[in-house]
Amino acid sequence: MSSSYYVNALFSKYTAGASLFQNAEPTSCSFAPNSQRSGYGAGAGAFASTVPGLYNVNSPLYQSPFASGYGLGADAYGNLPCASYDQNIPGLCSDLAKGACDKADEGALHGAAEANFRIYPWMRSSGPDRKRGRQTYTRYQTLELEKEFHFNRYLTRRRRIEXXHALCLTERQIXXWFQNRRMKWKKEHKDDGPTAAAAPEGAVPSAAATAAADKADEEDDDEQEEDEEE
């Protein structure tokens, strides 16, 4: 056999198959304008006849927005909560304005309370422009400082720190006290001349030194005030 025999035979088969598909009926998915399937019958025709009526814009169903089946009319919307909310808007606005007024009154009360607030001396700020008050020493602090001054009129930095920790004072306060005490001592001994001797180192404080400490605690020291103002 030659190859042309097989080619002619296959061609004849495919030609016969094509004729079979040409005689086949169209499937149900193809919608012809006037074709009806025998399986569906009159039901399909009835549905096709009702479709234009359902989607007709001139139908009474689309003319009235309130369907009779729901039992609602045009006046039924007056009873909805939206209408009552619209009617209550002025009242709500008045309540908001009243609340704002109450807050303003509350702020005025707070302002009056702050104006009447009492400020104590210890609550004030100690800025550089503020004049420092006069430092006062207790009886015990004055006595210990007088004892220290009796032994030595000038303190070293180390001894000043020790005395500050022992007497709960600052170094500046102790330095100011000793400076004022030295000025007072010079005024007391200026008539004695340059031969006035200082208290010997290691001497025990006498009753006169204790009495001087008590007197210094009671009287006002003008020189101390001048030093603190500087």
UniProtKB/Swiss-Prot annotation:
GO cellular component, one term: nucleus
DNA-binding region (UniProt annotation): 130-189
InterPro entries recorded: Antp_homeobox, HD, HD_metazoa, Homeobox_antennapedia, Homeobox_Antennapedia_CS, Homeodomain-like_sf
Gene Ontology terms: biological process: anterior/posterior pattern specification
Keyword Transmembrane helix: no
Localization per record: Nucleus
Record-linked SUPFAM superfamilies: Homeodomain-like
Compositionally biased residues, Low complexity: 194-213
Motif (Antp-type hexapeptide): 119-124
Keyword DNA-binding annotated: yes
Protein family according to the UniProt entry: Belongs to the Antp homeobox family.
Function text: Sequence-specific transcription factor which is part of a developmental regulatory system that provides cells with specific positional identities on the anterior-posterior axis.
Name under which the protein is recorded: Homeobox protein Hox-A7
Upper lineage: Eukaryota, Metazoa, Chordata, Craniata, Vertebrata
Encoding gene per record: HOXA7
